Amino acid sequence: MAAKYIFVTGGVVSSIGKGISVASIGRILKSRGLSVSVIKLDPYLNVDPGTMSPYQHGEVFVTVDGGETDLDLGHYERFIDVDLTRSSNLTAGEVYLDIIAKERRGDFLGGTIQAVPHVTNVIKQRIVKLGEETNVDVVVVEVGGTVGDIEGLPFLEAIRQIRNDVGRDNVFYIHLTLLPYLSAAKELKTKPTQHSVKELRAMGIQPDAILCRSDFDVPYAIREKISSFCDVPTKAVIPLTTVENVYEVPLILEDAGLGDIIMDALHLTGQPRDMSEWANMVTRMKELRDSVTIALVGKYVEYPDSYLSVREALRHAGLLHDRSVEIQWIHSEDVEKYGPDAMLSTANGIVVPGGFGPRGVEGMVETARYAREHRIPYLGLCLGLQVMVVEWARNILGLKDANSSEIDPDTPHPVIHIMEEQGSVTSMGGTMRLGSYPCRPVENTLAMAVYNERDVSERHRHRFELNNAYREVLENSGLIMSGLSPDGLLVETGEIKDHPYMLGVQFHPEFQSRPNRPHPLFGGFIAAAKLTLREGEQPPLPL
């Protein structure tokens, strides 16, 4: 059976939760026994977000096949519990690059290249191809940006055409909009929603359902008014009130009847609705009484979405151990300025996530030293492993000028250096070591104790690695190479001997954590960190 398509657009303002809404719709459909895939359409002209600043875009989410994608794909994977590929993110830059390459080759035989049909055809082909290749029941499509954006027009035209291409019974349009509250009038205003839907209809798209984002309860009379002006049944005008826990959103939408509306409109048959497992998880989150404090020491903490998957992975692990996780967002430059004692003394555990460039790295090195000397649980991700190695080389081996060649190209002791295959790379976009690669934890190590598997696969995004020229001397001094590539040439994980939990990894385990299945590295980290609630200097965890 051919896939059905659900398109989610946004109106009035951006950043009102389309990604969470799409992920929630996917969760609802999966709970009814349907298979689901998702694609995010981004109208910006970057080919992918891989070279975009975290301050503008947030984190870059890496897929199993090495795609550098929008952070919303992380929401999709966590909510729906699927592994997506680079095919689940399409940007305008990628579309235009494809078309221009074809034109230069002469594929269009001298024809005039236009937004319609050439741009729209590429967009449609990518959407339909995803449904065909994944062989799913439903493809949910998020259209980035806001209705009315100039760069989004070809994408809206493409999703309009798809309804005619695949049949009206196979497409469902959802419009997510904001209901602003005027405190002076003490009421929610519907006019922006009316105008947004009017503009959408002018493009030939009539929404089948409207999700109304609001910080306040939405009265039934407001829903009736929107229904009347926007030609949508009142039952399909669904309030979506702001909640503290985004994992509640699937339950809210299901209770509001969105699942039944979609199933009926698309003539889908599945299992009876059953969100009990998800509801139990959300209830457990609400009932957490004890907490654990984790210091996240990074370069981009002013914009926490830069570490969105790390934050969620910590949250998942906290739930596993019946702890809410309170994150202290600490800028690594502040550690340089004020010292680790002032910045880290109240933390039960420390995470140093990934990053690029020299800014703030010395603060991360000092953070690793503090965690080692004070026996505070430490989890280093990508750059977090590298600064752990640099700190050890400087303070244990006495190589005072040891560094990464990324940070100091002239260091006499490059304990971290560029990978051999990266040495000749000149282009920045899409050229790192990307995607899932195998790792083999070493017997009788913390890594093996945590994973309890001989072979694992983790997602990578890096150019630099531990320098094997220093590997023997590092290991002989107590820095254990506890996870290796299958050929034994690449150090994937390192850990400090006789420390409760000081583990660094060259990959990004946060991308594979799920609320119902926390990543073992984060689970082990929180298990160690929560012991500091009862004890000062904790004993080593048994292997």
Identify the meaning behind each predicted range.
Residues 10, 40, 214, 296-299, ...:
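Active-site proximal loops enriched in glycine and acidic residues that flank catalytic Cys/His/Asp
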Residues 109-120, 300, 354-358, 432, ...:
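Short acidic-aromatic active-site loops that bind/stabilize oxyanions
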Residues 2, 206, 233, 290, ...:
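A generic structural signal for well-ordered coil/turn residues at beta-strand boundaries
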Residues 434, 443-543:
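C-terminal and late-domain segments of enzyme folds
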Residues 16-19, 23-27, 31, 342-439, ...:
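Cysteine-nucleophile active-site neighborhood
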Residues 1-326, 333-349, 356-357, 364-370, ...:
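Flexible phosphate-sensing "switch/lid" loops adjacent to ATP/NTP-binding sites
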Residues 56-64, 243-248, 352, 373-379, ...:
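Short beta-alpha connecting loops at secondary-structure transitions
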